Amino acid sequence: MVSYRLFASGLPKGQHFTLWTWVLGSDPEAVADAFINPEGLIVNKLGDARHKEEPIDVRAVAGRGEKKRFAITSDDWTLQAFAEAVPFPIEQTVNGCHLWVEMSAPNYQGVVVRGSGFQPSESLTVDLASGAEGGKQQLNATPEGTYTAAILPSVKGKKSGKASVTISTPKCSVAVQFPWGDGSYRIQ
């Protein structure tokens, strides 16, 4: 289990907000009344001379590569702020090249692969494999030196398996591996 203490900037202090969480595969859920104290800390009760402030510590469980999403919204929805964190990332860094996977569908039936630290518009050799299926592609990094791809790792006739992504450039070769399908999701 991980715990997050949330802060906000650029929003009015002392105004009522609602704190939301969004678990993958379900609808967003309102979980608490929220206010922003003068320091930007999100609390469920503002302190005063007679009352102690009560910060909201969001506790969450997660699987590897699972994003936790939070939002605060004003009562009239004109003000909104969003945050996300991946408490247990599936990631690898080699020679400044960073590659990571975020679960985008339950049981890793869909993932988003992201990379950074590549040279602007650099040629990338991307090797995707899931079971005995896969292949290599020659692609280019973005002008910012990043890479993003959505992957559906399922293999016909299989209920589960392992997938891997390797990106190679002249300066680095970085790889990540992740399970998918039945039994792949495990709380850390």
Regions found by a protein language model. Give the residues of each.
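Extracytoplasmic/secretory-pathway segments with low complexity and glycosylation-like composition
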Residues: 1-188
